[in-house]
């Protein structure tokens, strides 16, 4: 199995570490108690621990939801994605997990206008308060293609600025929410 000692330290951001899920181990075979113990140790080592659950509400979602204390539900603005976000919000609420917020990703302001949809509509449909909006931005794909962090590749692009605002909100700072 993996341990915190296996965490990969980012070469550019040494305070950032990643521990990826094992590719050859189905979520159903992960020992929930051991996973919880590892997260307890991680919480002592790091200021923030993010668990990236797979899309949908399968075993990966249930495992991470069991141990997380705050949730960022990331969705697109399309109808199917918003329905999935609403389902995730409902399941979290049923589990007594009420500290969930919504990030609407890859938002195309012109497309939203064309289909007469607003971010408020997305929030209402998902039933979650908004943590942030990340606009559609080709720099995201370019940065990934070149194996670089978006914040290094194009620090002033729209998606990078939106990501920084979301990070500051997570840290408790007041940052305006706007689709720019």
What are these regions, as identified by a protein language model?
Residues 1, 5, 32, 36, ...:
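Amphipathic alpha-helical transducer elements in NTP-driven molecular machines
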Residues 1-44, 140-152:
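P-loop/Walker-type NTP enzyme "switch/lid" segment
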Residues 24-25, 106-110, 156:
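Short histidine/acidic/glycine/proline-rich micro-motifs that form metal-
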Residues 26-30, 76, 80, 154, ...:
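Short, surface-exposed alpha-helical recognition segments that flank or form part
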Residues 33-136, 142:
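Conserved catalytic-core segment of NTP-binding enzymes
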Residues 145-180:
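NTP-binding/hydrolysis catalytic cores, primarily Walker-type P-loop NTPases
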